[in-house]
Regions:
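Short coil turns that connect the paired helices of HEAT/ARM alpha-solenoid repeats
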Residues: 44-48, 79-84, 118-126, 151-158
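Generic secondary-structure transition motif, activating predominantly at the C-termini of alpha-helices
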Residues: 21, 35, 47, 113-120, ...
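Short, well-structured alpha-helical patches and their helix-loop capping segments
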Residues: 2, 81, 85, 104, ...
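Extracytoplasmic electrostatic interaction patches
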Residues: 107, 132-135, 150-154
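Amphipathic alpha-helical elements of HEAT/ARM-like alpha-solenoid repeat scaffolds that form extended
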Residues: 16-30, 49-63, 84-99, 125-136, ...
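Amphipathic alpha-helical scaffolding segments comprising HEAT/armadillo-like alpha-solenoid repeats
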Residues: 33-42, 65-77, 99-117, 141-150, ...
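Long, contiguous N-terminal structural blocks used for assembly/anchoring
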Residues: 1-80, 88
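Eukaryotic acidic, Ser/Thr-rich intrinsically disordered low-complexity regions
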Residues: 2-3, 8-11, 142-172
Length: 172
């Protein structure tokens, strides 16, 4: 029953996107009402027309509340989400111009690192590895090198220090 509800929601969201494509006011209201969790949910569903969603969001570049939710959701999913959420998020992030995304990454990545206060070293390793992957797949070489050299290299957790060695070896 729950699965059917999710599928109906996906079709409903695609339907809403189609209806609102030419009506900014209605689309803005729809996005403004969504919270971060709904954004996560929306962005992690493969059946949603993600590129159209991204393009429509660009219409709202001046509405920082919506853009902030969107960027944070994508970056969060790309670093702590499931494998499919990571793949979908990176795919969407690749469609966002570097100038728009660079500053948000600088703000959100440290927040995510700070939020991962778990004692579970493997969980921290997973998130740090996803952050490195995010920078790599986006082609952000400077940010990747900075994270590897300043965060991973001297980290107190051995698994994270090993990320530095792994990436350095892989880079050769």
């Amino acid at each position: 029953m729950e699965e059917k509800k999710v599928i109906n929601n996906i079709y409903e969201i695609n339907s809403i996107l189609t209806k609102f494509q030419n009506d900014k006011k209605k689309y803005f209201y729809f996005l403004e009402r969504m919270d971060e969790k709904e954004f996560f949910s929306l962005l992690s569903k493969r059946k949603i027309d993600s590129l159209r969603f991204v393009n429509l969001l660009f219409l709202f570049a001046n509405y920082t509340l919506i853009i902030e939710k969107f960027y944070y959701s994508l970056i969060y999913l790309a670093t702590v989400g499931t494998e499919s959420e990571v793949i979908n998020s990176i795919y969407l992030l690749k469609n966002i111009p570097y100038e728009w995304l660079r500053d948000k990454l600088k703000e959100v990545i440290p927040e995510i690192v700070e939020l991962i206060r778990s004692e579970d070293e493997e969980e921290k390793h997973y998130v740090y590895n996803k952050i490195l992957s995010l920078y790599y797949f986006l082609g952000y070489k400077e940010e990747l090198d900075d994270f590897i050299n300043n965060i991973c290299k001297g980290h107190q957790i051995e698994l994270i220090r090993e990320l530095y060695d792994d990436w350095k070896d892989w880079k050769k």
